[in-house]
């Protein structure tokens, strides 16, 4: 019996063979954006870079939560969970996190518990990662998308 894996692609669950899963995984990692659909900053970046027309896998983190495996893969690319963590999230102040000394395990836990703690957008293109909406990041992303 052939081993299969269940994956989510554009809101649909797919059962893929091990080989197909490997190919899907490579594709998904090569061009993917983790974003928040109702975030106007994310919307502007998606529109201005043309990501929505360039074959990117688009994961709205509000409706398709980031998985522990996905977050761990992003951490490998980014270098730390802290670099993926948003201090702009309303819950950051509500939970009094600015007064606490957070460690890597804490950043990971909070991102997995609350989608707004993921700095966004996070874009993967081949082996490069672009995190957040700072001007220099968006400029580099725009160059990479072209």
Predicted regions, residues:
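Conserved beta-strand segments of alpha/beta enzyme cores
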Residues: 55-57
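Thiol/selenol-based redox catalytic cores and closely related redox-interacting motifs
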Residues: 61-141, 145-146
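Short, well-ordered coil/turn elements that cap or connect secondary structure elements
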Residues: 51-53, 79
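Local sequence-structure signature of Cys/Sec-based thiol-disulfide redox active-site neighborhoods
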Residues: 29-48, 59
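Short, Lys/Arg-enriched N-terminal segments with co-localized hydrophobic residues
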Residues: 15-29
